[in-house]
Amino acid sequence: MTDSEAWPRSAAAFAEAVKLMPGGVNSPVRAFKSVGLTPPFIQRGEGAYLYDIDGHKYIDYVSSWGPLILGHRHPEVVDALEKTLREMGTSFGAPTELENELAREITTAMPAVEMVRLVNSGTEATMSALRLARGYTGREKVVKFAGCYHGHADYFLIQAGSGALTFGIPNSPGVPATVAANTIVAPYNDLAAVEDIFQKAGEEIAAVIVEPVAGNMGCVPPLTGFLAGLRTITKEYGSLLIFDEVMTGFRVAFGGAQALYGIRPDLTCLGKIIGGGLPVGAYGGRREIMERVAPSGPIYQAGTLSGNPLAVSAGLATLKVLKKPGTYERLESLSARLEKGLKEAAAEAGVPVTFNRVGAMFTTFFNPGPVTDYATATASDTRAFAAFFRAMLRQGIYLAPSQFEAAFMSLAHREDDIDCTIAAAREAFKGIAIGDS
């Protein structure tokens, strides 16, 4: 059976979609272009599983690109949303006590976040944090890292990761040269390069923004001393250190990567998990910096739906579950089981891969490794990855359709899901070894 025969309704839906939306999707990677398939159209999610309109069931490791750490339609999240709809409403454009609760949870979990502002997306969080850093320091330049993705604001689409990397356009048309000139790009995990940049332009640099665990060129952990070195350099030059924890916040640890690695940034950006699957973002940090945000200070930022009760209640319900004893130990156990099995399956087939993992986020790079930065990530065999992806999808395993995206474990996954995934990978690796596509 051909792929078009296996997914006829999805093929028809996508044919209509491309006439209505650019590329047929509302976010580029969803189009499945880099893996050579038409995307399955999803009908529903339940726990660790997705079901498409053609009747296929998948074990899901995309988790809506990270937010669904509890799995799809977790009962406590559903109950919270139903209660909010029934008793409150959808949005008021006015303060609610729920906002206080979520802000309190975030600031308690992350001591570096002394005050927080809720927004509607990770992009809003990072662009607002950077404006704040520039306004606070009176400087204009920012240092980012090649392959790190911080949303689609102009000044971040310079050697970016995520979809920009997947489609080979890390520098997007439409980004003004004057904006790009104030963005300095350094290699991830290269502290010497950062030191050199600061020696040349340190007095002009407002901030360094970094994914403490890069997740948008695949999962790339920080080398020992890298994050601590960034903290030392930024303090020395009076620049701010911004952790983009949109992906890692409440995933790699309840207190995020800053808790895992013991680093205290000046500003933190959040999203994904704190909305429980609904659109959300947040940025926060030291009180003296955050008090510069309007209406307390002159640095403006606003949003119609910021702090809306639906997203906030879903986020609160999610964090409540994550705070239960044994939660992160469970995620680690499942993730380690999968890592061991995938490594063994690849080795048995003689397929060179590198498995990078931090907690419940991971990537299988088709690359003998090590993978520590943009250059080594992009040296991966994307054709082999595409073949692996197709083989896994046909066996009911739903992975991110890009070599350069992290995958995610959820609390809804079970040991038999992991074992099923390993068995599917064993067949997929065997196929790659003999040249199947």
UniProtKB/Swiss-Prot annotation:
<dbReference type="GO" id="GO:0006782">
    <property type="term" value="P:protoporphyrinogen IX biosynthetic process"/>
</dbReference>
<keyword id="KW-0963">Cytoplasm</keyword>
<dbReference type="GO" id="GO:0042286">
    <property type="term" value="F:glutamate-1-semialdehyde 2,1-aminomutase activity"/>
</dbReference>
<feature type="modified residue" description="N6-(pyridoxal phosphate)lysine">
    <location>
        <position position="272"/>
    </location>
</feature>
<dbReference type="InterPro" id="IPR004639">
    <property type="entry name" value="4pyrrol_synth_GluAld_NH2Trfase"/>
</dbReference>
<dbReference type="Pfam" id="PF00202">
    <property type="entry name" value="Aminotran_3"/>
</dbReference>
<dbReference type="InterPro" id="IPR015422">
    <property type="entry name" value="PyrdxlP-dep_Trfase_small"/>
</dbReference>
<protein>
    <recommendedName>
        <fullName>Glutamate-1-semialdehyde 2,1-aminomutase</fullName>
        <ecNumber>5.4.3.8</ecNumber>
    </recommendedName>
</protein>
<dbReference type="GO" id="GO:0005737">
    <property type="term" value="C:cytoplasm"/>
</dbReference>
<dbReference type="InterPro" id="IPR005814">
    <property type="entry name" value="Aminotrans_3"/>
</dbReference>
<dbReference type="GO" id="GO:0030170">
    <property type="term" value="F:pyridoxal phosphate binding"/>
</dbReference>
<keyword id="KW-0627">Porphyrin biosynthesis</keyword>
<keyword id="KW-0413">Isomerase</keyword>
<dbReference type="InterPro" id="IPR015424">
    <property type="entry name" value="PyrdxlP-dep_Trfase"/>
</dbReference>
<keyword id="KW-0663">Pyridoxal phosphate</keyword>
<dbReference type="InterPro" id="IPR015421">
    <property type="entry name" value="PyrdxlP-dep_Trfase_major"/>
</dbReference>
<comment type="subunit">
    <text>Homodimer.</text>
</comment>
<comment type="similarity">
    <text>Belongs to the class-III pyridoxal-phosphate-dependent aminotransferase family. HemL subfamily.</text>
</comment>
<comment type="pathway">
    <text>Porphyrin-containing compound metabolism; protoporphyrin-IX biosynthesis; 5-aminolevulinate from L-glutamyl-tRNA(Glu): step 2/2.</text>
</comment>
<dbReference type="GO" id="GO:0008483">
    <property type="term" value="F:transaminase activity"/>
</dbReference>
<dbReference type="InterPro" id="IPR049704">
    <property type="entry name" value="Aminotrans_3_PPA_site"/>
</dbReference>
